[in-house]
A protein has these predicted regions:
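Short alpha-helical segments that sit at the start of domains
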Residues: 4-28
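Conserved segment of winged-helix/HTH DNA-binding domains
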Residues: 15, 36, 81-99
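Short, locally clustered residues in the helix-turn-helix/winged-helix DNA-binding domain
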Residues: 20-23, 32-39, 85
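A short acidic, leucine-rich amphipathic alpha-helix
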Residues: 46-48
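Helix-turn-helix DNA-binding motif, specifically the short coil turn and the N-cap/start of the second
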Residues: 54-57
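Short, hydrophobic-biased segments on the C-terminal half of alpha helices
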Residues: 62-63
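Beta-hairpin "wing" of winged helix-turn-helix
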Residues: 67-76, 83
Length: 99
């Protein structure tokens, strides 16, 4: 197997893992919300209140997205917020495919 083929397989595997992490309606809603609030990100509380979900559910989904490298935690003053790791346009393009 040549280097380009190996690289391609790795890239496709990474893309599949990322899409797998996004493959839930609540996670897509979280990503859409984070797209609109990219500057300072959003707290877990803000996310669960806006989406009318339970806090443990949002925390679990954010953890899955964080482990996939899609979102990251940032500290804003005393609070921990979540924001997108990927470029806003990339996420918006992906989310638009589903909405």
């Amino acid at each position: 197997m040549n280097i380009n083929r190996k690289r391609y397989k790795v890239e496709m595997h990474d893309a599949a893992e990322m899409l797998k992490a996004m493959a839930h309606s609540d996670r897509l809603a979280i990503l859409k919300l984070l797209c609109k609030n990219q500057a300072d990100g959003l707290s877990v509380k803000t996310i669960y209140e806006k989406l009318q979900l339970q806090q443990p559910v949002v925390s679990r989904h954010l953890n899955i997205l964080k482990n996939a490298g899609i979102v990251r935690r940032i500290q804003v003053g005393q609070k921990i917020n979540y924001c997108l790791c990927m470029g806003k346009s990339t996420i918006e393009s992906l989310v638009k495919c589903f909405y």
